[in-house]
Regions:
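Conserved D-loop-proximal element of ABC-family nucleotide-binding domains
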Residues: 191-195
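C-terminal lobe/lid and adjacent interdomain/linker elements of RecA-like ASCE P-loop ATPase modules
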Residues: 199-275
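Phosphate-coordinating catalytic segments in nucleotide- and nucleic-acid-processing enzymes
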Residues: 2-181, 248-275
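Walker B catalytic acidic pair
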Residues: 187-189
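Walker B motif beta-strand of ABC-family P-loop ATPases
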Residues: 183-185
Length: 275
């Protein structure tokens, strides 16, 4: 089977790249409120130690903590609400019987879409505009697009041959609509997508009251939609690289208003907020 590793989430060749200047002897530490997460490396790989406010300490291999496998799938859905999704270059089918999109690459996408009635309805409407029909081939377990040629003939277009924008929209909407009480992590959901369809994803994010989202983006369309419709629930963090370190700065309420006023030019003026 496919190797389950941290490389599915972070673009690195070896684990040492996670650490500042490659120094694996110094743990990575992330603190929030009264909790702390530490990342270390041993002979078996990357380990994460979680320290809670009630002094409980748990150490788990990275694969158990963040990756859904057939061995830990039951625990994953109840214990760990954090789910990172990365649109894959190639979809690999997984016949795991769960009702949410499997992180990180949505290997059960086809099955999940068939369970989401609202998503199926929306896809039907989108393809109807082009005289096409959304269908699900139960034999191959794949989403397909059908064109009726007349005289009882049809032409089937496989999922992987439809527009990249539509594939990505289906992937992210399936992730949003199939999850509840979860923290969803998306990396540039706008990539390779036509702006009107980006808005369909951001609208789902805004309307999803049961999930929290962490999103990296370089899209003024994504930022503008969120600022316009969800500012009270929004925190924007800007990143910079100074003196060999990654710096993260949270925008203030007044800066959020300035960002909205910049509109499409926001990403040409980020230095204004990083001073």
């Amino acid at each position: 089977g496919k190797k389950k590793s941290i490389q599915q989430f972070i673009r690195i060749e070896n684990d040492a790249e996670l650490f500042f200047n490659g120094n694996i002897d110094q743990s990575i530490s992330v603190k929030a409120d009264d909790m702390e997460a530490k990342v270390d490396i041993d002979a078996k790989g990357v380990n994460v130690t979680l320290s809670y406010s009630d002094k409980e300490i748990i150490t788990l291999p990275f694969s158990n903590l963040l990756l859904s496998t057939k061995k830990n799938i039951d625990d994953f859905s109840t214990v760990n609400p954090f789910k990172s999704y990365f649109y894959p270059t190639i979809f690999e089918k997984d016949k795991v019987s769960i009702n949410y999109l499997l992180p990180p690459d949505g290997s059960n996408l086809m099955t999940v879409v068939t369970q989401q009635n609202e998503l199926k309805k929306e896809l039907t409407e989108i393809f109807k505009e082009y005289d096409l029909k959304y269908v699900f081939d139960t034999n191959s377990q794949e989403i397909k697009i059908m064109k009726e040629k007349g005289s009882g003939e049809i032409f089937l277009i496989p999922f992987h041959s439809i527009a990249d924008t539509l594939q990505r929209m289906i992937f992210y909407k399936a992730a949003i609509e199939s999850n509840q009480n979860s923290v969803l992590i998306f990396e540039e959901p706008e990539a390779h997508s036509y702006p009107p369809y980006i808005s369909k994803i951001t609208q789902d994010i805004i309307n999803s009251e049961q999930n929290q989202f962490f999103i990296t983006t370089h899209s003024p369309y994504v930022v503008n939609d969120l600022l316009e419709q969800a500012e009270k629930d929004l925190a924007i963090y800007l990143t910079d690289f100074k003196d060999g370190e990654t710096i993260v700065k949270r925008a203030t309420s007044s800066e959020l208003q300035e960002m909205y006023e910049y509109g499409a030019d926001l990403f040409f003026n980020t230095e204004t907020f990083l001073k």
